[in-house]
Structure formats: C-alpha cells, structure tokens
C-alpha cells in the first residue's frame, strides 16, 4: 500500500500537447507503449494491459522510437499532408503544407481548420502555399501540432500515473513475499540499477533550468528555448559579448517581440529579421526541446554510457549513499562485537531489517522522483498556462479592439444613416422650394408669353397700318414716276422741236445782232442827239420795245423762280419721303430682330429650365438610390435592433421617391404643354417673320439702286490711296537700306568676335610664358643648389689648407682648385643674378599681361553684352520690318482696288459730263440754268463728301507717318546709345594691347563710319518722306482747286 503522503504520482506518458514542445518519456514499462502509440495515434494503446505486463516491460531493453523523441520546432516529425491534427490541442484541422516559407525561417506546417477561426486563406505576403476558404488557414510550428485534443492527453497522463502506481505496488509486494531462501540483492547494486533506470527514464521530464554550468554544457546552436517564461525561440549565439560581461545567449524569437536583428552596438553576432533578435543571460534561458540535428536516441545512449558518474550530480545520489552507509554500519556491528555464532533467526531478522530499509529507501526514492516529476509538470503547466494566458489575453484584446471597432463602425454607420435621412429630408424641403420657384418661374414665363402675344397683336396692327401707308407711298411714287415720264417725253418733244427751231433761232440771233447794232447806233445817236422829241416818228416804237424787253425779262425771272421753287419743293418732299421710308424700314427690321431674339431667348430659357429640372431630378433620383443602397448595405450588417429604423427609413425613402415621381410626371406634362404652345407660337412668328422679310426684301431692292448711286462718291479716295502707296513704297526702300546697314553692323560684330578670339589666344601665350617662368625658377633653384655645393666644397678645401701647411704642393693644387671653384661660383652668381633679373622682368611682364587680359576679359564681356543687345534690337527691327511690309502689301492691294474704283467713277463722271453738255446744248435757256444749278448743288454735296473722306485719309497718313518716325527715332536712338560709345571704348582699350590687336582698331573705325552713316540716314529719310508727303498734299490741294473752278 502506498503511504498517504498526499502527493499525486507523476505521469509517465507522452504529452503531445505540451506548449514547450517537450516529450516526456516514462519508466521502462511505458516507453515502448508510447513509442507504439505514437504510430497508432492513441497514447493509451498499450497501457491497459495491467500490472502483469510491467515486469516484461521492465525487463525489456530501452529502445524508444526516434520519431517520438524528435519533437523540436524545426522538425516536421512524421506528419504528412492530409493528416488530421489539432493546433495547440484545441483547433482541429487537416495538414495541407509542410516545409519552409518566405515569411519566416525554419519549418512550418499549413493547416486548414474546420472552423473560420484562422488568419488567412493559404497565402501570406502575396505567396500562396495552399488553397482554402478565407479565415480557415493557419501556419504554425510542427511542435504545436497533436493528433489528439488536450483533454485526451491529460487523461492518458492520469492513466499512466495509475499504471505506474500499480507497478510500484506489485514490485513492493513481490519483494516482500519471497522466502528466506531467495537471492538477496546487494544494496549498492540495486540502488544503482534503480537510479540508473529512473535517471534515464525521467531525464526528459527534469527541468533544464539547473546551474549555469549545466546550461553552458547543454545549450547549443539550434536548440529551442524559452526566454523569461513567455518568449520562445531558437539559439543562434552562445558566448561572451562586447556590450556586457559574462556568458550571453542570442535567441531568434518566433514572433517580433525582440529588440534587434542580431547586432548590438555595431557588432553582429548572428543574422535574423528586425525585432526578432534578443540577448539574455544563460541562467534565464530554459531549453524546451532537443536540437533538430541531434536525435533523442543518441542523447539517451549518451546518458546510459555515463553510468554511475551521472548519479553523483543527481539529488538522489546523496540519499542513496547515506542509506548504504547506514546499511553497512548496521551490518558491521555484529562482526565487531564478535557475535559470530548468532542463530539463524537473528540472521533472518537482520535480513528482514535490511530488506525493510531497502523498501523504505525505494519508497523515498519514488517519492523524490514523484516530487521532481510533479515539479517539472507544474513548471510545464505553469509555462503552458502563462503562454496560453498570454495568447488568450492577446485574443481578448484583439476581440475587444474588434468589438470596439465594430461598435464604433456601427455607431458611425447609424450616424451616417441619420445624417443621410436628415440630408434627404433637407433635400426634399429644398426640392419642394425649388419646385415652388420653378412654378413661379413658369407662371412668370406664361405671363411674359401672354404679354408677348399682346404686343404681337399690337405689332400686327402697326404692321398693317405701315403696309397701308407703304401702299399709299407706292401709289404716290407711281404717280410721280408717271409725271417724271411725262416730263421726259415732253423734254424729248422739246428736243425734237428745238432742232427745227435752230435755224429760226439763228435767224433771230442774226436779227437780234442787227437789232442790237441798230439799238447801239440809236443809243449813240440818242446820246449825241439827246432824248427824241415827242413828235418824233420812232419814239413810240422805241418805248414800246423797251417795255416789251422789261416785261419779257421780268416774266423770265418770275418763271425761273417758280420753276426753281417747284423743283426744290419736289426734291425736299422726295427726300423726306425717302428718309421716312428708311426710318420705317430700319424700325421694322429692328422690331423683327427683337422679336426673333425674344423668341429664341424664350425657347432657350424654356429648354434650359427643362434640362435643369431633368438633370436635377435625375441626380436626386440617383442620389436617393445610392443612399438607399448604402443604407441597405450598412444596416444589413448592423445588429437586429436597427431593423425598425431601417423599415422606417425605407418607408420614408419610398414615400419621397413616389412624391418625386409624381412631381416628375407633373413637370413633364407641364413641360410638354408649354413646348407645344411655344412651338405653335414659334411657327406663327416664323410665318409673320417670313412676310416681314419679303416686304423688307422688296424695300431693299427698291432702295438698293439709290444706295448704289451713293457709292460713286468714293471715287476720289483712290487717288489719295495711290499717293499713300507711293509713300509706303518709298518707306519700304528706306527700310531695306536700313536692313543692309544692319547687316554691315552684324559683320562688324563678327569681326569684333574674331578679335576677342585673338585676345584669347594671347591669353594662351601668356599661360605659356607663366610655364616658362616656372621652369626658369626651377633652373634658378637648381643653380642655387649647385652654388651651395660649391661653397661647401670651398669651405672644406679651406679647412684642409689650414690643417696641412706642410704639404705646399698639395696646398697649391688645392688653392688652384679653390680659385677655380671661386670662379665657377662667381660665374654661377652672375648667371643667378641674370636669371633673377630675367625672372623679375618676366614677372612684371606677366603682371602687365594679366592686367591687360583681365581688362580684355571685362571688355569682351561688355562687348558680348552689347552684341546681345544689338542682336535683340536687330530681331525686333526685323519683326517691325515684316509687320510694315505686310501692312504695305495690304495697303498696295487696297490701293489697287481703290484705283480701279476711281477709274470706274471717272468714266461714269465723264459720261455724266457729256450727257450734261448735250442736255445744256439742246435745252432752252431757263431749263438749262435750272439743270446747271441742280447739277452744281449735287456736285457740291459730292465734293464736300469727298473732301471729308480726303481729310480722314490725310489724318490716317499723318498718324502712320508719326508712328513710323517715332519707331525710326527710337531705333536710331538705341543704335546711337548702344553701339557707338562701346566701339569707341573698345578702340581706346584695344590700342593699349599688343600688335596683334591693331586690326581690330581698323575694323572698329570702319564700324564707326558705318554708324555715322546710319545716323545721317534717318534725317535724309525723314526729309524725303516729309517732302513726298508735302508734294502729295500740294498736288491734292491743286486738284481740289481745279475741281472747285470747274
């Protein structure tokens, strides 16, 4: 019987659902069962055989399966694709992928879960590993997969514990029942065997958090470890570091909960993604699995090979050694006291005491093992619970965040729905207001249409009255035409009669001349003789003739005045009627145009209003439809408590929709009626407009002949246009001359550029001189060095001379050498002085050249700026020339047209003059005088109009001349300011340079001459232009005077 210690016996079965991925092997009796059950998928497959199988299991050799021991995170185990598994012992699913991935290093398993509680659909980071529905795929380490759920695993542990206790009881009873003749096992041997077995079997369940020394021995690269009790990872580095003293362990975590990427303070210890690396002291790192590269079988054989040496470090070895010492002391006492002749009963009691001690030791050992196992289990369960709590807390936090987000989204959607409802209501109110406004506008339009119809009736009455008046005027015109034809016929008859009466007129003229001669003679006689006496026979006849002459002259004057007044009145009446008809025509045209504009405006306004209404209603309908769809989409996903509001909103929206449809129908009907009315009115107005247009066309044909007569007044304008053409041609020639001069100036600028390039060559020569100077300095330095060497030799020779006075011959030789050296030194000094002088001269020349070059560079820069300014001015002038040439071309075309019209008008004038002369010849005296006066009045009006036109053209010409003179003055002023002073400066500055720049001075003088010539040209051009214009004006004045004389 087991002692009531209150402790639960430890479980020896395999735990596949351990959060740390560790597989716990039991005693010898359960190891084979676990190995077999791992293949069959049940941990209790071979533990139900009862206590009878325990001795055989204990006697069987320890051969655990390799797949049951290799349970590291990076080891795939014996899982296959399509196998049924549980993730963390909770989530059932099917394995669909096994291998490496791109999102994290190591081996991973892709599982398709039964429920949508996963994280993906088989794709991570844009890479697809398998296919499954959304939120049913998950990737995990193979160590977190089990073939059974967690509840069954805990049951297997309890069952293994019960079997273990049964085995211990059977062993205990077996050891107590044998007879005295049975073989007694020595204490040391039995304890060692049991300790070896228990140590080997319970080694995987023992905690790996021993001393630092043991951690250093066991931790290897690639081991799965637990850092701080919560973070799992793989060992990537073990050893000393630069950032702190002691032994440190570098771990690559499974999740981004670290602090680095394997590098600290610029030193890299291993490689991993950012936030996946973590360094910790070795005593804080707990190994939770074996390395993926070293199988568990090799580990177990290694432990068995260690033998008894492993027991020295185990906590049970000390108790075993103390028990053995107690047993040895108990067994040794009889031998010391000399009790060798004890009886067999005492011997049997001694044996029973030793067996009791052995059993007590075994029970203590078992209790110790159970406590250790329970401690390991508790630690594993605590670690599992902490990890599970962390995961649950994370899930709870995620669920809380999702719930809060969902609540916030639902509130936002509800708020949006409310806002949409409010906006729809506001839009409904706005639409009702707009409909009211549109109705008012339609009523206003109807009122306007009625007003237009009233005004249209008034206009029709006015047009009828005007038609009647026009008919009366046409009748009066016909009467006047008939009268004019009658007068023409009378004139023709008079012309025929005058031909017959010419001879009589000649005779009468001859008689008149004779009579005049006689009258003169008589007058002379009367003057000489005085008044005739009353009794003279010719006195009565003379008086009678005088009276007749006076009466004839008075009658002739009276008749001419009457005819003149009559013709003037008729002309004034005709002119007034013509003016009235013109005003009426213009008035009718304006009224017709206004009516057309009003009709078009009304139709366009109606169409615009209808288009606006249609677009507004369409947009409102589409907006309402969209808002309804959005509300349906948002409210369908919300909770069930919002269904009532959704129903209300749907009802409200349907009501609004029906109201809008009704309003649309009403508006469409009104629009159709209004459009039909407008179309009818438009057709009626078109008919009236066509009638008015026909009437206007008749009036226009009637007055077109009279307007063509007025066009003959513009014939004299052609002469002035021809004069303008001549002036323009002269100006074009002047501009061409200026263009030639500008081209010469451009050539001068190019020459200056060439001179600048020569100056640049000079600069290159100056650089060469600088190089030669540097070489001369180097030679001077070398000569100085030689001089120093010679002086040293001279000093050495002098020292030799002072020390050796005895050797005179040698001293003479040395003196000769010193003389020679002195001469060479003097020659070198002379050369050095010469070179110094040359160097100073060269330096002065170089400085002068530098100053000249800098001056030339500044001059070149200024010259380039001026050249650019001149080029810009040239381009501007060319553009002005082009515009002027275009204007002159257009003016020449206009002049040609005007000249043709002048020729036509001159021909018509000549024909009219011929007709007038013939009419004057054939007409009698009073009619001739009247026609002359009429024609003079007409010609005076025409001359006045022509004079006005001539004045306008002269003013235009003067304006053009002023613009041209201003542009010429501006151009010449720019030329004078920019080119001439700069050329002078360049001349004065280039004269101070070397002989290579003299050609530039000559060219500059040529350019200056060109500029002076250009200065003198504008005055000549202006004088020529002014003289030409003055001659033209003088000729025009002469022509006008001649015309006035005629």
Curated annotation (Swiss-Prot):
Broad class of the protein's primary localization: cytoplasm
List the InterPro entries hit by this protein, alphabetically.
CAP-Gly_dom_sf (IPR036859), CAP-Gly_domain (IPR000938)
Q: Which PANTHER family match?
A: CAP-GLY DOMAIN-CONTAINING LINKER PROTEIN 2, DYNACTIN 1-RELATED MICROTUBULE-BINDING
Q: What is known about its subunit structure?
A: Interacts with CLASP1 and CLASP2. Binds preferentially to tyrosinated microtubules, and only marginally to detyrosinated microtubules.
Provide ranges: composition bias, Basic and acidic residues: 1035-1046
Entry's disease: CLIP2 is located in the Williams-Beuren syndrome (WBS) critical region. WBS results from a hemizygous deletion of several genes on chromosome 7q11.23, thought to arise as a consequence of unequal crossing over between highly homologous low-copy repeat sequences flanking the deleted region. Haploinsufficiency of CLIP2 may be the cause of certain cardiovascular and musculo-skeletal abnormalities observed in the disease. However, it has been demonstrated that haploinsufficiency of this gene alone is not sufficient to cause any of the cognitive or facial features of WBS.
User: Which UniProt keywords are present, listed alphabetically?
Assistant: Coiled coil, Cytoplasm, Cytoskeleton, Microtubule, Phosphoprotein, Repeat, Williams-Beuren syndrome
Kindly list any coiled-coil regions of this protein. 354-524, 561-636, 673-1016
* Summary of the function given for this chain in its UniProt record: Seems to link microtubules to dendritic lamellar body (DLB), a membranous organelle predominantly present in bulbous dendritic appendages of neurons linked by dendrodendritic gap junctions. May operate in the control of brain-specific organelle translocations.
Tell whether Chloroplast is among the UniProt keywords.
Answer: no
Recorded hits in Pfam families, A to Z, give: CAP_GLY
What SMART domains does the record point to? CAP_GLY
- Under the cellular component aspect of Gene Ontology, which terms does the record hold? cell cortex; microtubule associated complex; microtubule plus-end; nucleus
> Which species is this record about?
Homo sapiens (Human)
Q: What is this protein called?
A: CAP-Gly domain-containing linker protein 2
User: Which residues are recorded as modified (Phosphoserine)?
Assistant: 49, 202, 207, 211, 314, 923, 973, 979
The GO terms describing molecular function are: microtubule binding; microtubule plus-end binding
In what residue span(s) does the CAP-Gly domain sit? Answer: 99-141, 239-281
| Composition-biased stretches (Low complexity) | 27-38, 48-69, 314-338
Gene Ontology biological process terms in this record: cytoplasmic microtubule organization
- Cellular compartments annotated: Cytoplasm; Cytoplasm, Cytoskeleton
Which top-rank group of organisms is this from?
Eukaryota
Which stretches does UniProt call biased (Polar residues)?
Answer: 143-153, 195-210, 1023-1034
Q: Where is this region: Disordered?
A: 1-71, 143-162, 195-215, 313-339, 1018-1046
């Amino acid at each position: 019987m087991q002692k009531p210690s209150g402790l639960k016996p430890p479980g020896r079965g395999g735990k596949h659902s351990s959060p740390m991925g560790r597989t716990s092997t039991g005693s010898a009796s359960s190891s084979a069962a676990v190995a077999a059950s791992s293949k069959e998928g049940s941990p209790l497959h071979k533990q139900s055989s009862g206590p009878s199988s325990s001795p055989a299991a204990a006697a069987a050799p320890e051969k655990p399966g390799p797949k049951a021991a290799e349970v590291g995170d990076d080891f795939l185990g014996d899982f296959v694709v399509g196998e049924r598994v549980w993730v963390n012992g909770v989530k059932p699913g099917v394995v669909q992928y096994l291998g490496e991935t791109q999102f994290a290093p190591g081996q991973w398993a892709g599982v398709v879960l039964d429920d949508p509680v996963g994280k993906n659909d088989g794709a991570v980071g844009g890479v697809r590993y398998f296919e499954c529905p959304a939120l049913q795929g998950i990737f995990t380490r193979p160590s977190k997969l089990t073939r059974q759920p967690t509840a069954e695993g805990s049951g297997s542990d309890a069952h293994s514990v019960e079997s273990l206790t049964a085995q211990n009881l059977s062993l205990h009873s077996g050891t107590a029942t044998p007879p005295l003749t049975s073989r007694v096992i020595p204490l040391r041997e039995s304890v060692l065997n049991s300790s070896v077995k228990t140590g080997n079997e319970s080694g995987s369940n023992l905690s790996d958090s021993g001393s630092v020394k043991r951690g250093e021995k066991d931790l290897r690269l690639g081991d799965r470890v637990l850092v701080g009790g919560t973070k799992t990872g793989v060992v990537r580095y073990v050893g000393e570091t630069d950032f702190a003293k002691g032994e440190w362990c570098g771990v690559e975590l499974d999740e981004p909960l670290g602090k680095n990427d394997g590098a600290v303070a610029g030193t890299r210890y291993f490689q991993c993604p950012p936030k996946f690396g973590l360094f910790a002291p070795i005593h804080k790192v707990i190994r939770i699995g074996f390395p993926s590269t070293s199988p568990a079988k090799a580990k177990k054989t290694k432990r068995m090979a260690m033998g008894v040496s492993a027991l020295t470090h185990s906590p049970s070895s000390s108790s075993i050694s103390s028990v053995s010492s107690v047993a040895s002391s108990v067994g040794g006492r009889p031998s010391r006291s000399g009790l060798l002749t004890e009886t067999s009963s005492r011997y049997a009691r001694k044996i029973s005491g030793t067996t009791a001690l052995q059993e007590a030791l075994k029970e203590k050992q078992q209790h110790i093992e159970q406590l250790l196992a329970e401690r390991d289990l508790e630690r594993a369960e605590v670690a599992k619970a902490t990890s599970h709590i962390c995961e649950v807390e994370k899930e709870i936090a995620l669920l809380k965040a999702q719930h809060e987000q969902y609540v916030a989204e639902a509130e936002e959607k509800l708020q949006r729905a409310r806002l949409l409802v409010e906006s729809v209501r506001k839009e409904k109110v706005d639409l009702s207001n707009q409909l009211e406004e549109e109705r008012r506008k339609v009523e206003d339009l109807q009122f306007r249409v009625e007003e237009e119809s009233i005004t249209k009736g008034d206009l029709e009455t006015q047009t009828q009255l005007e038609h009647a008046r026009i008919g009366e005027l046409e009748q009066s015109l016909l009467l006047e035409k008939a009268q004019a034809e009658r007068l023409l016929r009378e004139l023709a008859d008079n012309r025929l009669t005058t031909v017959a009466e010419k001879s009589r007129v000649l005779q009468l003229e001859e008689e008149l001349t004779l009579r005049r001669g006689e009258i003169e003679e008589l007058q002379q006689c009367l003057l000489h003789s005085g008044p005739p006496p009353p009794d003279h026979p010719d006195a009565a006849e003379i008086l009678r003739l005088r009276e007749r002459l006076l009466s004839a002259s008075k009658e002739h004057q009276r008749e001419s005045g009457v005819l003149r007044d009559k013709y003037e009145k008729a002309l004034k009446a005709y002119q007034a009627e013509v003016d009235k008809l013109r005003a009426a025509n213009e008035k009718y045209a304006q009224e017709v145009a206004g009516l057309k504009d009003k009709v078009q405006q009304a139709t366009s306004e109606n169409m615009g209003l209808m288009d606006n209404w249609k677009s507004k209603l369409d947009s409102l309908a589409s907006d309402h439809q969209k808002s309804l769809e959005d509300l349906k989409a948002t409210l369908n996903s919300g909770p069930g408590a919002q269904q009532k509001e959704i129903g209300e909103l749907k009802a409200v929206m349907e009501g609004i929709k029906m109201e809008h449809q009704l309003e649309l129908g009403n508006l469409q009907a009104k629009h159709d009626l209004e459009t039909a009315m407008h179309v009818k009115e438009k057709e009626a107005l078109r008919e009236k407009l066509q009638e008015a247009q026909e009437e206007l066309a008749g009036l226009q044909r009637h007055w077109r002949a009279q307007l063509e007569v007025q066009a003959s007044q513009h014939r004299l304008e052609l002469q002035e246009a021809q004069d303008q053409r001549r002036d323009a041609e002269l100006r074009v020639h002047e501009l061409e001359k200026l263009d030639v001069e500008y081209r010469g100036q451009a050539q001068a600028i190019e020459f200056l550029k060439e001179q600048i390039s020569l100056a640049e060559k000079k600069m290159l020569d100056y650089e060469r001189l600088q190089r030669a100077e540097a070489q001369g300095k180097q030679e001077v330095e070398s000569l100085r060095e030689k001089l120093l060497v010679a002086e040293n030799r001279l000093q050495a020779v002098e020292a030799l001379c002072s020390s050796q006075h005895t050797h005179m011959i040698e001293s003479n030789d040395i003196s000769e050498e010193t003389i020679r050296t002195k001469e060479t030194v003097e020659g070198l000094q002379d050369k050095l002085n010469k070179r110094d002088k040359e160097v100073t001269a060269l330096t002065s020349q170089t400085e002068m050249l530098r100053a000249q070059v800098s001056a030339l560079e500044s001059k070149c820069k200024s010259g380039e700026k001026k050249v650019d300014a001149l080029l810009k001015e040239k381009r501007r002038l060319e553009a002005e020339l082009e515009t002027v040439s275009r204007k002159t071309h257009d003016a020449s075309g206009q002049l040609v047209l005007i000249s043709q019209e002048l020729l036509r008008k001159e021909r018509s004038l000549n024909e009219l003059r011929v007709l007038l002369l013939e009419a004057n010849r054939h007409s009698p005296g009073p009619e001739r005088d009247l026609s002359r006066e009429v024609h003079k009045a007409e010609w005076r009006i025409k001359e006045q109009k022509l004079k006005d036109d001539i004045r306008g053209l002269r003013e235009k010409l003067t304006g053009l001349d002023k613009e041209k003179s201003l542009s010429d003055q501006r151009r010449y002023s720019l030329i004078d300011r920019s080119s001439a002073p700069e050329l002078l400066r360049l001349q004065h500055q280039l004269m101070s340079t070397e002989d290579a720049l003299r050609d530039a001075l000559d060219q500059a003088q040529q350019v200056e001459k060109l500029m002076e010539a250009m200065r003198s040209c504008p005055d000549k051009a202006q004088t020529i232009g002014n003289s030409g214009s003055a001659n033209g004006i003088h000729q025009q004045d002469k022509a006008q005077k001649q015309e006035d004389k005629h």
